[in-house]
């Protein structure tokens, strides 16, 4: 296993922790800053929008840079953003700090995925991307529950200080072991933008948007759902987040292998499973053990899609891998924002936390429809890999 993949996974762990840990700390942040749970949920939306907006601009701004230099600069922005989160004096400053942190997110994962795929033979690309994204799933296995526990014990700001420390270690690792690609072709802006033509590419992005919307409609409000519906204590929420993280990790590994097998077939099955497990939580969420089992299966289904979606979008934009890969991360976070908004809308309109899983299931069905349309378009275009 190349050491570079391990360092990329560590970087993904740091970024994933700061993105997702806010969900476990939502009640704490809301109470400390004197805002409602839905208002605190906008910190998730703000981060996601920061990724969506920053991703294409950062990708284009670093297009002429060697990929190693770009990743180092992006990790530096990440560290600064988390420093600002740790010292934020109020809700507005924390929101701004979250957006600053988010600016590096899309481009880092996009460029990092291209680097990861370039380190292995072509028939193992999805598995290599999955290995990098293992850092993201481990952020949910370890980073989110430990960060939540730390935030509950020592204040939510302490969690962001811990993320800063991890970011510094990741930055050093990138500098030391990431290979310099001296044969990298200099990017041509016109060629990069031309790669965005075609219905298939935009359908592939829509798959990512609806998938992420489904996932985050539920994930954003999982802590209050567990506490208020299932009756789990704050300490118990940490344990459930750990279980969800294990499911995400398992799904990521399985998803990488499935994507190397048959891309579209795998995604169809994954989105069906995501829709079913999301809907099931509407009823299983009333009791502890059924809720835990459902959330584990839901998490496995959710992250099984990630490596497949990343490889799928590059299939439609081979002439600009950095840009299209980064745009896919941006699409993921557009979906993140959409999902958090939909979940908050459901709650604000009096439908209750138990209606959120049904909304998530509906969004998963939209991802399934987009997948079928994308596969059809791929067959028409002769892109066998995507179909």
Model-identified regions with their sequence ranges:
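Paired small-residue
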Residues: 6, 77-84, 92-101, 289-297
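Helix-breaking motifs and short loop linkers at transmembrane-helix boundaries and internal kinks
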Residues: 34, 66, 87-93, 231, ...
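Conserved MFS/SLC helix-loop-helix module at the cytosolic interface between two early adjacent transmembrane helices
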Residues: 53-92
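Helix-to-loop junctions at the C-terminal end of transmembrane segments
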Residues: 55-67, 251-263, 347-348
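Cytoplasmic helix-loop-helix junction between adjacent transmembrane helices
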Residues: 97-135
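Intracellular juxtamembrane helix-capping segments at the cytosolic ends
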Residues: 108-120, 304-317
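C-terminal membrane-cytosol helix-exit motif in multi-pass small-molecule transporters
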Residues: 164-184, 370-374
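C-terminal transmembrane helical hairpin of 12-TM major facilitator-type secondary transporters
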Residues: 265-309
